[in-house]
Amino acid sequence: MGDAILAGFSMGTGEVTRYLGRYGSSRVRKVVLLGAIPPFLLKRDDNPEGVDGKVFEDMKAAVVKDRYAYFKDFLDNFYNVDVLAPDRVSEQAWQASFAVAAASSPHASHACIDSWLADFRADLPRIDVPTLVVHGTEDRILPIAATADRLPGLIADLRLVRIEGGPHNIGWTHSEQVNRALLEFLA
């Protein structure tokens, strides 16, 4: 396989980034990152723009205490339902997402939070193909200031599309804008 377009959403953007960091882009033509997790989410001395580690510890504690309540809070912020429901996300769409989350492994629900803290900074310079990043300006899961807004300059050929008012799941709530950006980039 060659001439591939790699695309990822949320945690999947980390998978795409790590793949290119490890294996290079010889078989890849373009990259799409929707709701990007890179460069590095965790706040540290060498990453002051990151998110405080207590946020993630509190999330893991919430999963242990009552993962269904955690899923409700997470999905409310995934879609920004307080602002966008019912016009951009229906109760049925939210319930479908909840059903998927509830069917997940309890262990995976907890363990995946640590995977969000992977450091992709060394992988980013290896991305040497045209890259589209599409991110919601009101993303409460992966705040744009800690993620996508930091990518220009870290990836050589990057186009950043900021979806005004967009939550984390912009593919659902702002599909027209996301699809337009994708079609323009892939043309």
What kind of region is each of these model predictions?
Residues T17-K65:
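Flexible "cap/lid" loop of the alpha/beta hydrolase fold
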Residues I127, V133-H135, D139:
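Short beta-strand/loop motif that positions the catalytic acidic residue
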Residues P39-G50, A61-P125:
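Conserved alpha/beta-hydrolase catalytic His-Asp/Glu region
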Residues T137-R140, G165-P167:
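Acidic beta-to-alpha connecting loop that harbors the catalytic carboxylate
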Residues R140-A146:
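Conserved alpha/beta-hydrolase "acid-adjacent" motif
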Residues A156-A187:
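Catalytic active-site module of serine/aspartate enzymes centered on a nucleophile-bearing elbow/loop
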Residues S10-M11, G35:
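Catalytic nucleophile serine of serine hydrolases
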Residues M1-S10:
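Alpha/beta-hydrolase fold nucleophile elbow
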